[in-house]
Amino acid sequence: MARRDPFDRPRERARGVGVEAAVYRDRARRLGLSFVPFVDLGRNARSDIAAIHAATFAMSSDARRLAYLAPDDDAIPAILRWLAAHPAPRARLKVSTPSAIRTALVAARQEKLAADAVSRLSSAHPRFSARRVVSVGQALGTLLVAAILIGAASVAPLATIVAVNLVGAVLFFGVTALRFVAAGHAARRPPPIADIGQTVTAASDLPVYSILVPLLDEANLVPGLVRALSRVDWPSERLDVKLLLESTDRATIAAARHAVRGTSFEILIVPPVGPRTKPKALAFALPLCRGAFVTVYDAEDRPHPGQLREAYSTFLRSPPEIACLQSAIVVLNRRPNWLSRMFAIEYAALFDAVLPVLAALGMPLPLGGTSNHFSGLR
């Protein structure tokens, strides 16, 4: 049974910003409070991850001391009773949408999120971080090998060249042998699942699934990306799509804001702290994900509509220690040529043959950098 999202909101989240605003404007009218489409918390407003996920309440930090609410329909009777007993604060209470409150709370915490994205891993788990490119042991090992090669070449140059070539030949032969093994394994593999994800169909049985898409200088790809993500076969109220944009990339920000109109997709602006890289953008967004599962796509990706259901079904059938799945990536070119066909063959060999045999042998898998699915976030 899927875990329930503790921050799950009613279905208006999935209907788009316009419908969401209309719903909360009506709730403001029923409460006798003002509705505001945008939330201004001022400088130094308090914000934490739980408040961002809930997106039901925020307090401004300036002299106005305004309180912004995004009440569920079921909460309205209790709020009316509270207002009747406490009429004085009514003027400082405003109703807004969860999207507007969430955006304001993220903005209030963005410096902390950005700082954590840059340094949290290297501080907490330095051996898993790439901030230090070469360790002391690696540097010493490299120097030792170089010294041995230089010494051997000075004493017996011909024998050294032969030895280096033999070692290289063995390594290249190993790669070739792996591909032959992979080809034989692929020929014996059963066909892929025909009924993708049919083990789970009811929306109530599905968890919230987060989709992260980091973008940089890719404004021309945004419309096609949004159309492809809109076709994903997953209940829209249980889909958490976040487009991650750099604050200096104005063209892509403008294209994204235009493309996501009428959807529940969220735009996250990554502050200009540290490097403008895909890992930093993903680390910035990860604490804000609502989903128990998360996948990463690139701007040029056009995921199969059934990919999330297939991934979730695979997680359900897999041992609990399986935390990541790599989807197959198929290369498509609008104007194919010889080079693009060779590229497509290379990708097909990797994702349809080499990676499956590495998985069957229990060996480490090189991830493709996109279409990776992760579980166990909640």
Give short role names for the model-derived ranges.
Residues 83-119:
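Extended, hydrophilic extramembrane loops/domains of integral membrane proteins
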Residues 177-211, 215-238:
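N-terminal signal-anchor transmembrane helix
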Residues 13-85:
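Polyanionic, low-complexity intrinsically disordered segments
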Residues 230-274, 316:
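Acidic donor-binding segment of Leloir-type glycosyltransferases
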Residues 107-203:
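N-terminal membrane-anchoring/stem segments of glycan-assembly enzymes
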Residues 298-302:
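The conserved acidic donor/metal-binding loop of glycosyltransferases
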Residues 294:
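Short aromatic/hydrophobic "clamp" motif used to bind/position activated sugar donors
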Residues 260-264, 269-287, 305-378:
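Long helical/loop segments within the catalytic core of UDP-sugar-dependent glycosyltransferases
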